[in-house]
């Protein structure tokens, strides 16, 4: 199975001073499924990692295959439709499109308000990870 990974999870893992660092670190060591993201989210990750002085750590994770980056022929079209429909950034919309493409309802994010208000193509709510508890 796959879980779609949002930028804030990766930033929290890289930045020990991030308010969500401990929660992200506890979650990541218990998770064994494929962690997948999009090039749009990766660009955000790169930007924030650079700002936090963690760019090399992010690049090492990418080289080791910690995260898989997926894109497909009509990804941009799907992303634009979702972004307009839900007033999302292109990065966030691309993650929703990716979840649909992978047929997963699991998104790793600390942005519960935004992703918790969205549903899968089948109309089911996304499972937001890590658990709020």
Language model features with spans:
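Short active-site oxyanion
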Residues: 1, 31-35, 65-67, 101-106
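Alpha-helix/helix-capping structural signal
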Residues: 8-9, 40-43, 113
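Active-site-proximal, substrate-binding regions of enzyme catalytic domains
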Residues: 39-70
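Active-site phosphate/pyrophosphate-handling residues
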Residues: 8, 46, 89, 93-97
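Short, well-structured N-terminal submotif of metal-dependent ribonuclease cores
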Residues: 1-36, 49-59, 122-125, 130-133
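Acidic catalytic patch
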Residues: 16, 64-86
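Acidic, PIN/NYN-like endoribonuclease modules and their adjacent C-terminal/linker elements
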Residues: 96, 102-133
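Short beta-strand scaffold positions
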Residues: 5, 36-37, 70, 90, ...
């Amino acid at each position: 199975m796959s879980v779609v990974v949002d930028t804030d999870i990766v930033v929290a893992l890289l930045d020990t001073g991030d308010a969500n660092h401990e929660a992200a670190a506890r979650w990541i060591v218990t998770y064994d499924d494929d962690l997948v993201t999009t090039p749009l989210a990766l660009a955000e990750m790169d930007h924030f990692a650079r700002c936090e002085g963690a760019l090399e750590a992010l690049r090492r994770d990418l080289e080791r295959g910690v995260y898989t980056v997926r894109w497909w022929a009509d990804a941009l079209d799907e992303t634009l439709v979702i972004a307009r429909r839900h007033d999302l950034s292109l990065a966030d919309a691309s993650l929703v499109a990716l979840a649909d493409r992978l047929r997963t309802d699991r998104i790793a994010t600390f942005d519960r308000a935004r992703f918790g208000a969205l549903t899968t193509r089948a109309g089911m709510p996304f499972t937001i990870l890590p658990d709020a508890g």
